[in-house]
Amino acid sequence: MAINESAENYLETILMLSKTLPVVRAVDIANELGFKKSSVSIAMKNLRENNHIIVSGAGYISLTDSGKEIAEMIFERHELISNWLMSMGVSEETALEDACKMEHVISQESFEAIKKFIGK
């Protein structure tokens, strides 16, 4: 199933927050991304309906297997692309911004070629 860039960003954010927080809530996601809680709630509803997240009765958000798979793929792309750009002399700020855009549009074939080229 195709998933849009916004959904990928939410899933990646949930993954990152789950590594540092005991539980992830919509307010944590809103704070991390600088969005209104109401916007995050709508996105969480869509992710839940597409079986990418589970929301407990207490409002705790966790990734399903499919959500985690997507989040980890996007996170891997982000890390590899940003590090690759910085290794070529791109400033950290620019590399992180560019990686955030590129991670969503690069084909798997091109991403694998970059990984092979840089020896990862």
Model-identified regions with their sequence ranges:
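N-terminal helix-turn-helix DNA-binding core of bacterial DNA-binding proteins
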Residues: 2-35
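Key DNA-contact positions within bacterial/archaeal DNA-binding proteins
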Residues: 38, 93
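Short hydrophobic beta-strand motif reused across regulatory alpha/beta modules
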Residues: 53-54
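N-terminal positioning helix adjacent to the helix-turn-helix/winged-helix DNA-binding module
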Residues: 6-9, 25, 66, 77, ...
